[in-house]
UniProtKB/Swiss-Prot annotation:
Its EC number is 5.4.99.25. Keywords: Isomerase, tRNA processing. Pfam families: TruB_C_2, TruB_N. Belongs to the pseudouridine synthase TruB family. Type 1 subfamily. It comes from Rickettsia typhi (strain ATCC VR-144 / Wilmington). The gene is truB. It catalyses: uridine(55) in tRNA = pseudouridine(55) in tRNA. This is tRNA pseudouridine synthase B.
Length: 292
């Protein structure tokens, strides 16, 4: 069974699920998952987990992400991007100085109200489905972190500014765009959105897929990234034969390590065996991997 990561670049015009299905057809009957949905009209990095790597997807969902996005000032749409219906307009367009200076206001921990057109479930139904039916849904504010935000370019004539941001999981760029525009006494919506990094996965070494591409299983295997790659900066303990057996069968396993650790991974014969925590030298497994 194949167990690895793939660093794909999702183009505009297809859903994240569609990209997963394309890859499934190429590599066959293997479990595949993606680490963080990208909207159909967005493009950029979409890491795919194959086989046992799917057990680590949550780590990437929780990882920092970077985006480059362009804002059109002067109007607001019902879904926050250029595909939506204009629901409000304002003549005021911020100056270049204002477009650059506003960034500092958003760096740090902030609250965001998710957009109506989002995948959040409300009573078991996706918010965007309710929004398409014309139903008004009240979504609660969420805490997110903006680690960096800077303006890369400003076109006064077109009323468009391009920004770069590094942010935490759960950050909605459409909401950030609207809040940023409001802070500038204007309105705004996203006209371009590109995700440039998810954890260790960057766009410069991503696999680009197009309709005309003949991507084969052999090509994908060559582009595969080892399952442990996303664990490189996390504490690892090497297990003995006895410890490995205990972990594999869910038995109590003690390591010669005195400090408590909230998250670490265990390696056996150079291969990922499990992830978990350490409490009073006792390993508590969160996930055990079938790689041996």
């Amino acid at each position: 069974m194949s167990n690895y990561w793939l660093n794909f670049y999702k183009p505009k015009g297809i859903s994240s699920a569609k990209l997963v299905n394309i890859v499934k057809k190429i590599i066959g009957k293997t479990k595949i998952g993606h680490a963080g949905t990208l909207d159909v009209e967005a493009e950029g990095i979409l890491p795919l987990a194959v086989g046992e790597a799917t057990k680590l997807i949550q780590l990437l969902i929780d990882a920092k992400k970077t985006y480059i996005f362009s804002v059109k000032f002067g109007a607001q749409t019902d879904n926050g991007d250029y595909t939506g219906k204009v629901i409000a307009s304002k003549n005021y367009i911020p100056s270049q100085e204002e477009a650059y200076a506003v960034c500092s206001k958003f760096i740090g921990n902030i609250k965001q109200i998710p957009p109506m057109f989002s995948a959040i479930k409300v009573n078991g139904i996706r918010a965007y489905k309710l929004a398409r039916e014309g139903k008004v849904v009240e979504l609660k504010p969420r805490n997110v972190t903006i680690y960096d935000l800077k303006c890369l370019n400003f076109d006064k004539e077109k009323a468009i500014a391009t920004y770069y941001t590094e942010c935490s999981k759960g950050t909605y760029i459409r909401t950030l765009t609207e809040d940023l525009a409001l802070s500038l006494q204007s309105l705004g919506f996203v006209i371009e959105l590109r995700r440039t990094q998810v954890g260790i996965f960057k766009e410069e070494n991503a696999i680009h897929i197009k309709a005309s591409d003949a991507i084969t299983k052999n090509f994908i295997d060559k582009k595969s990234i080892k399952i442990e790659a996303i664990l490189d900066d996390i504490l690892v303990l090497d297990a003995t034969d006895d410890q490995a057996q205990k972990i594999k069968y869910g038995q109590k396993c003690v390591f010669d390590y005195e400090e408590d650790v909230n998250f670490l991974w265990v390696r056996y014969n150079g291969t990922l065996l499990a992830i978990g925590s350490l409490n009073k030298s006792c390993f508590n497994s969160l996930r055990v991997f079938n790689l041996l």
